[in-house]
Amino acid sequence: MWKWLHPYAKPETQYRICGKLSPLFAFLTLVLLGVGIVWGLAFAPADYQQGNSFRIMYVHAPTAIWSMGVYGSMAIAAVVALVWQIKQAHLAMIAMAPIGALFTFLSLVTGAIWGKPMWGTWWVWDARLTAELILFFLYLGILALYSAFSDRNIGAKAAGILCITTVVILPIIHFSVEWWNTLHQGASITKLEKPSIAIPMLVPLILCIFGFLTLYIWLTLVRYRMELLKEDAKRPWVKALAQTLK
């Protein structure tokens, strides 16, 4: 049934496919983020309560969303690698980790910048903020654990187990504003009822959310190719590729 997938399981085939897809996602990222951020910063109306300080939302909200999305994707890849013994899934997980760490860092920094005029302080030990900070440390822990072993396979398995066992942090982050009395506002665009954000503000936000998604995919494709080269450095296909680049 799955025989048609076998040719695509070869590292050299995956390397080539990722190379072909990368320019597409780079272009989509440029268009979506270019339009979304310019629209949000320059043309979206000021908020009636927050004034222009709300505009940092166009970076903060997408990076916060995908900081969780990347970790969830890593956990899925880790399960695939451990259950079905697919080595490339571990490579994909490791390829995503620095991107997720970057998104989490950006969400924390932009959140602090946004929080200063709104809350009067750069940081509070709010449930959502604290959980997001823990997520950042989990990303760093996965990268550190992977690098701690001389055997890349053992390091990848250890990092995968850590990712799977800590993925529970994601519902804690998402539902923290409902479970605890927090300063952080609730969802603005994921509600079943009418979104609590004006359409002229909402459209560029959606563009930025999809823009950061394509950025995540693009960077993952680039990093996954690098991981494939490192993993198969002594394989004939990598040596042949090196010869063509000389």
UniProtKB/Swiss-Prot annotation:
Keywords: Cell inner membrane, Cell membrane, Cytochrome c-type biogenesis, Membrane, Transmembrane, Transmembrane helix, Transport. Its main location: membrane. The keyword Cell inner membrane applies. GO terms for molecular function: heme binding; heme transmembrane transporter activity. The chain crosses the membrane at residues 24-44, 64-84, 94-114, 129-149, 160-180, 197-217. GO terms for cellular component: plasma membrane. It is a multi-pass membrane protein. GO terms for biological process: cytochrome complex assembly. It is found in: Cell inner membrane. Required for the export of heme to the periplasm for the biogenesis of c-type cytochromes. Belongs to the CcmC/CycZ/HelC family. This is Heme exporter protein C.
